[in-house]
Amino acid sequence: MTQKTILNDTHRALGAKMVDFGGWDMPIHYGSQLDEHHQVRRDAGMFDVSHMTVVDLHGARVRAFLRDLLANSVDKLKVCGKALYTCMLNPQGGVIDDLIVYYMSEDFFRLVVNAATREKDLQWIGEQAVRFDVRVEERSDFAMIAVQGPNARANVIDLLDPADTAAASKLGRFAALQTRSRDGIELFLARTGYTGEDGFEIVLPQEAAVAFWNALLAQGVKPAGLGARDTLRLEAGMHLYGQDMDDAVTPYEAALAWTIALDEGRDFIGRRVLESQKAQGAPRQLIGVVMDDKGVLRHGQAVFTASGEGEILSGTFSPTLGKAIAFARVPAGSIDQLRVDIRGKQVPLRAVKFPFVRDGQAQPGVLGD
């Protein structure tokens, strides 16, 4: 049965086109995906991300548990509210999910995990938590709204209790604080996002979500759907679980080496495979590609290299760049001469470093200059 967020009726009243996304009835756009994309890059847009799963972890050994569970090291988290992006791996080094972990206190950490992986994540986390006597609490009582764009933070801060605006203004990236709105709504405010723009992801009680969404609307923040969220995140070089990596792909094969902490004295699930791949090299690599010819790059298209065949993972037409961009997974080795199969025709590709877009601008080399 398709699930609905607390904002479902609100989306429909705003004229949203709704689609099934991982079992959730979600807005793909509110009229123009292109306009919504540019709105976020140039001003501020908001997304209903209440389908995401918030998991609270409690216990005296919760830090030790996360040192074992996650490939990145929670020992980096020393200040309450600080956050870390990480992968959670299986014993073969494959990515069970990518997630954000927040340090709330020494006996309380918070995870935000993907909607499509909710059931397997909760089962895996629950199984591993037993050894550490950690209590796993899914917070299905929460909704989540992401406000993103150059003017996003200012619009949100205007709605906060005046006593909290200074702290919210000073909040650093990948950090969160507990605050409240002018109307007394309790908010978990995180300076994170999935668009490459600045902004906040806001966790709040479900029963307060419609009122807060409407307050943002009154501020002039426009709603944006999953379509724009996808083009924005790909321009920003951000991965989509299930498309760019999965249980059979290691972080080294997904260009996520920066999320691995092989710190001394810490054994974590999947570490031995990662140590081997670091020493010997991973057999596959994820790269960013741009197609200068007309057309769109789509998931599953074959990519040919001097070292063998790979495929397009996430692909789209970039509204900011005016070109087709994609992630591709190809064999390790040279990526100088790349071609993609589009309806039987081999079309040249250029390998580029990602993100493709930062602060609304094309990154060096992306446009071929």
Curated annotation (Swiss-Prot):
The keyword Phosphoprotein does not apply. Keywords: Aminotransferase, Transferase. GO terms for cellular component: cytosol; glycine cleavage complex. The glycine cleavage system catalyzes the degradation of glycine. The glycine cleavage system is composed of four proteins: P, T, L and H. This is Aminomethyltransferase. Belongs to the GcvT family. It comes from Xanthomonas oryzae pv. oryzae (strain KACC10331 / KXO85). InterPro entries: GCS_T, GCS_T_bac, GCST_C, GCV_T_N, GcvT/YgfZ/DmdA, GcvT/YgfZ_C, TrmE/GcvT_dom1. The lineage of its organism: Bacteria, Pseudomonadati, Pseudomonadota, Gammaproteobacteria, Lysobacterales. It catalyses: N(6)-[(R)-S(8)-aminomethyldihydrolipoyl]-L-lysyl-[protein] + (6S)-5,6,7,8-tetrahydrofolate = N(6)-[(R)-dihydrolipoyl]-L-lysyl-[protein] + (6R)-5,10-methylene-5,6,7,8-tetrahydrofolate + NH4(+).
